[in-house]
């Protein structure tokens, strides 16, 4: 079964079975050839935490291949994580990829406990790169979808560095949209529009 067909199926399931923003497309784990996870610790997502993946990544780069490398690295002997660390990943073209199970506690290389955090990462290094318009738009739509689907308040939207003194993640060029409340305001607007339908 090819990747395009799987993505179409996943999109249809999202349309029929979910109540979040309707234009959202999430590529399933099979799209990037995910390995099966190891046994994991469960949690209930209660807040949204934004990351950047931390490596320079451009629109022309192969996102599925890179995501697979991130999973392989994370599950390797140096980290020994149960899966890719994030619940969702967004590439610079605005494509969204399913990461680990949302009800699995995510991973971090810093000191904060990610239990209860739904981890969304934007692919790139936003200390050095700007966030693309497509990536920012996809991030806002995905957060609104997750807030709606998992009953998470937009007031919980924060970043990795808000919980850890050991990192600048998600980078100054993404963090500025949290500092000025742009992301939170846009998410709240999407949720308000949905509530009026």
Predicted regions and their residues:
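Hydrophobic h-region of N-terminal signal peptides that target proteins for export
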Residues: 10-18
């Amino acid at each position: 079964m090819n990747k395009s067909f799987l993505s179409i199926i996943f999109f249809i399931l999202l349309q029929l079975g979910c109540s979040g923003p309707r234009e959202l497309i999430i590529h399933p784990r099979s799209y990037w050839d995910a390995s099966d996870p190891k046994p994991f610790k469960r949690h209930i997502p209660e807040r949204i935490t934004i990351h950047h993946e931390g490596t320079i990544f451009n629109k022309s780069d192969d996102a599925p291949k890179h995501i697979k490398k991130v999973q392989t690295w994370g599950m390797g002997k140096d980290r020994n994580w149960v899966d890719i660390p994030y619940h969702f990943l967004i590439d610079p073209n605005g494509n969204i990829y399913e990461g680990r199970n949302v009800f699995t506690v995510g991973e971090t290389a810093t000191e904060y406990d990610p239990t209860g955090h739904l981890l969304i990462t934007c692919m790139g290094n936003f200390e050095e790169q700007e966030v693309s318009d497509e990536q920012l738009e996809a991030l806002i739509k995905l957060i609104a979808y997750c807030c709606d689907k998992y009953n998470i308040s937009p007031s919980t939207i924060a970043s990795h560095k808000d919980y850890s003194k050991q990192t600048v993640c998600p980078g100054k060029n993404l963090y500025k949209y949290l500092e000025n409340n742009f992301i939170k305001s846009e998410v709240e607007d999407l949720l308000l529009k949905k509530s009026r339908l």
